[in-house]
Amino acid sequence: MNTRTQKYIAEVLGTFILVFFGCGTAMFTKANVVATSLAFGISIIVAAYTFGKISGAHLNPAVSFAMLVDGKMKTDEFIGYVISQVIGAFAATGILSILVACGALGKVWDVKKGKDITAGIGDSSFGANGFGNMNFFGALLVEIILTFIFVLVIINVTESEDEGTKKHAPIFIGIALTFVHLLGINLTGTSVNPARSLAPAIFAIGATDGSSIAQVWVFIVGPMVGAFIAALVNSILLRKKK
């Protein structure tokens, strides 16, 4: 097995872990802010320590895009990473949909319709993102800012000249993902990751009356713009010149 194939497999598995536990927790706790934030943060720590030495554990097209802009990836490798991340996200959401079909959200008998309906202990929207009470510009701005901060942290801790910081980079990245979720969940549900948003948006079409797929472009464009700005700011303003 060649190194590039191993990287792609690592990205599939790492993204699966992130989406399965992050979006799964959002579903089964009705998007409890603290629980969901911690689930995403801890998941990325676990995935980064597990797969970081193989692929760098991007687990996110926005992160890979920042690396492409920064000159750390070639275009063909970037495309392979993104495809792998999307596959991992869809696999995780697919498993969550099977759990829902098996009654993981509980079942309530609808007397009027005369059938079981999913209800009760969770939310069947698969952790899909949405505009909340904002318009598209507000949601887009939130995603750009949150992704900018998140990706800027990733670039700097993984490039740090301090060995202690670099060694524990997954922990800092996990903390960063946790705190952007603490703010963002009540605004957009927090994406900062196009793959994490695309899969739930498609699976949640029925539960959201189509709004999840109609709004998903914001959660693709916003994170990519935020990542681009982060790579640019780091390159121009923060990186030490040799």
Tell what function each PLM region has.
Residues 1-242:
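Membrane-interface helix-loop junctions and terminal tails of multi-pass membrane proteins
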